[in-house]
Amino acid sequence: MVATLRRCAAAVAAGAALLLSGCGGHPSPGPLSAMASPAIPPSVADIPNPLRGQYEDLLNPLFPQGNPAQQRYQAWPASYDASMRISWRQLQPTDPATLPGDAPDDRKFDFSAIDDTLTKLASRNMRLSLRIYAYGSDPHDPGIAVPEWMRPATTSYPAPPNSPGATQVVPNWDDPHYLDAFGRLLAALGRRYDGDERLAVFEFSGYSQFRDQSVSVASIRQLVAANVDAFPHTQLVVNPQNPEIVRQLLADDVTKKLSGPVGIRSDCLGVASPLPGWAESGDSQYVRNNDAVVNAIKQRLRSAPVITEWCSLPGGADPKGYYEKGLHDVVKYHVSMTSSANFPDRDSTSAMDPKLYALWAQANAAAGYRYSVQARPGSQSIQGKVAAISVEWTNYGAAAATEGWAPNYKLVDYTGAVVRTLPATVNLKTLVHDDSSPSREEAVPATSTDTVHVDLSGLAPGHYTLRASVDWQQHKPGASHVVNYGPMALARDGRDGSGLYPIATLDIPRDNQISTSG
């Protein structure tokens, strides 16, 4: 017994046995103790973060607060994101042939609408997703999207007889003059906005499908190169209706030129799948031939943003089935963002049915990433002077975070001061479950376990808290305007004023004494 006590005393002197259980050969769990903090379910609350959930589509206010008839429902949490589309006609009304060759971009183009929108959004802590269009696909809109001086490179298609539609003015997509001029527009936009962190997303621009009108592979390559060269530091997305455009944009050589893989921007949530028919239908030649582009777009859903817009409810369709499909597709196709407009109840003058609202709300809350973190009880240990504990990171959302978020741990003393910052090894970008169920109403949680090691050397006796945070690191090189966000909001309680979440306590006794019995 005396020998045992001597061995224990020696261990204390070395500082290696803060909480050993009698030094009888049984390892101690160590001084770390897990703190329980269950995740907040998507059915209870939305967790707002950048590039996820409901966004202000085409600058329309969020629902339900954007509709006075929906005051019975609580306002949706503010979004970090809004989208805008603007016509080429508005951006470049002046024929460049009438200007000096060395005229600055501000004389060649009218950027005021984009500049004003960026400024207003930044004042609300928001960023912009931008699309430029040369053809407006609304069959009832007689507006012309190309500048007047570009009319010779277009074709007018009258509306069918006895129809309420308007004449459509569509660019000749393979016209060299059109391609060259639109490429110069993209280059100017890139010079002005690619280094602006207020611009989060740029949608592939320069082509829109009209009836059975086609575009050549050579023209596609030219447009893809123009978009990629203009915005190498901005997240690109593409409406995937044209498989050859998708093939080019998802190619490895394009991905290497960009800050991140190209994402998907899909129309018609609630009616059509976020994946186009050519990538899913058994009648598609791409599916039948097992074309590589089919697998490429399916895999891309898990690694890049999927931004959706709701679709108008078809005549005679069931609203319940519409919202159910929207929810199921959000989960199945890893949707990141859902629009604030274009669904049936958006502008309704009567209150939304509570059951339909629940489906709509669940679709928005499930969209995007939804991380939580907690230490696993009973996993703590100590070896020498290093205490350890297992930490579980779980994503309860339909998609992974795709931007620059850096998880880490901080050891905080009783005064609230951070005394240690410890690295995390979890990769949040890969933390998403690949579930293809067509009718799931919640994403399958995906969990990754990290081990935190705390070196006790040099720590003064006292009470400490081990806290987790996910810090914003999404920046553009040499940015003209910088956007800084606080740490990511996690789906759990306990966030402190610095955006940290407590996961464990660490107690170092004042005297480091070891109690023995017998």
Task: Annotate each PLM feature.
Residues L32-D174, A296-M352:
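N-terminal substrate-binding region of glycoside hydrolase catalytic domains
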Residues L20-G22:
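C-terminal motif of bacterial Sec signal peptides marking the signal peptidase cleavage site
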Residues G24-H26:
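Bacterial signal peptide processing site
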Residues P158-V215:
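Active-site groove signature of glycoside hydrolases
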